Regions:
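N-terminal capping/interface segment
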Residues: 1-39, 64, 71-78, 87, ...
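Histidine-acidic metal/acid-base catalytic patches
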Residues: 1-13, 17-30, 144-161, 171-332
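Active-site acidic/histidine proton-transfer and metal-coordination neighborhood
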Residues: 62, 71-165, 171-172
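Conserved, mostly hydrophobic/aromatic
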Residues: 31, 40, 56, 86, ...
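Acidic-and-aromatic substrate-binding clefts and catalytic sites of carbohydrate-active enzymes
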Residues: 14-21, 38-52, 69-78, 101-111, ...
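Hydrophobic faces of well-ordered beta-strands that scaffold small-molecule active sites
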Residues: 2-13, 38-42, 61-68, 94-96, ...
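Acidic (Asp/Glu)-rich catalytic clusters
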Residues: 1-3, 25-34, 46-65, 77-91, ...
């Protein structure tokens, strides 16, 4: 049982999306001065690699994980390139967000996802940076039951299966009929094949936790039927799906809904469950948790509350519960 590292997405080192862009040095300085983080998460663009290396060394904040999104049929070489960049920074993992549709426009198959992952894993094992497939909207894994299906395919070929869990993408779909129509998961729910609510026995998050698939985790709070982001639109005119709920009570005018911290209970329960599993189970695969309050359209675009402060306070809460949980299991 190892202590968990707690980090922050570089995309979340910003107060609001209306602020002037920050230099990378300023972002690293903010993260370091908060004393809340052990690392930061990012795959640097090629032209910024030297500046990232300088800031990592200056502020003693390593890049323990990279992240990128990929379209199969187009980005296989980019995937390997980003794993290589991660290895040069000492990143343990690289979070791969694989889009739901192939370059040819068809939905990606489980076999295609498995082959993509295995190719990255074979390369990553040689260079020291391992891929984790992320549970995420707009990706193949938004059809949540497919995660276990791909895992079985990968394991049957003798490979270890690793995921990045971002359970905000599960919690916001609870009591959310519109979101449950995507990939027809409402039918899986009605048939009893898929349980989203972490308070219910056999829920999908508990299944993934017990499987030890989860090696990396993203922490960004949401609530059931999370309010949509009415202050931001996609290019097609649709408003943000709403996959972020403030962890810290916003000041008046910073958020359009009445904030209720009690509604965070389901999201917090999953964090506590995975931390409990980690410190009670020597077989736990989890190594690190990245806070990921961010500003894109489906998340925090247009809001007045501080994205960075939510990352800091969430990280401090996670640190607190990990310390309490560790002591509980040591004393028992």
């Amino acid at each position: 049982m190892n202590d968990l590292f707690i980090g922050c997405s570089v995309f979340g080192i910003i107060h609001t999306d209306s602020d002037s862009p920050l230099t990378l040095e300023k972002q690293f300085s903010m993260a370091a001065e908060s004393e809340a983080f052990d690392y930061v998460e990012k795959t640097p663009p090629l032209e910024e690699i030297d500046e990232y290396k300088r800031c990592c060394e200056k502020f003693k904040l390593p890049l323990r994980c990279g992240i990128w999104f990929y379209t199969l049929g187009k980005d296989e070489d980019l995937f390997l390139q980003n794993l290589k960049i991660g290895s040069e920074f000492g990143s343990v993992y690289h979070t791969a967000q694989d889009m739901a549709h192939h370059e040819d426009g068809q939905l990606v198959t489980n076999e295609e996802i498995g082959n993509f992952y295995i190719a990255g894993l074979n390369y990553g094992e040689k260079i020291g940076c391992l891929p984790c497939l992320e549970v995420h909207v707009n990706m193949w894994s938004e059809d949540f039951l497919r995660v276990e299906q791909v895992a079985q395919m990968v394991q049957e070929q003798g490979y270890k299966f690793r995921i990045t869990l971002d359970h905000s993408h599960i919690i916001f779909k609870i009591d959310n009929p519109e979101e449950q129509k995507i990939f027809d998961i409402d039918k899986d729910i009605n048939d009893g094949k898929l349980i989203l609510d972490p308070y219910e026995e056999g829920n999908i998050c508990d299944q993934w936790i017990k499987s030890n698939f989860i090696h990396h985790m993203h922490a960004r709070s949401t609530i059931p039927n999370n309010p949509k982001n009415i202050h931001a639109q996609h290019p097609d005119g649709s408003i943000g799906r709403g996959i972020q709920y403030p962890f810290v009570k916003p000041l008046p005018g910073q958020y359009h809904e009445k904030w209720d911290g009690k509604l965070l209970d389901r999201w917090k329960l999953v964090v506590q469950s995975i931390v409990d599993h980690h410190y009670s189970n020597k077989g736990s695969s989890l190594e690190q948790i990245t806070t990921e309050f961010i500003t894109p359209t489906d998340y925090g675009a247009g809001w007045g509350y501080s994205i960075f402060n939510n990352n800091v306070q969430c990280a401090k809460w996670i640190r607190q519960i990990t310390n309490e949980t560790k002591l509980k299991f040591i004393n028992n």
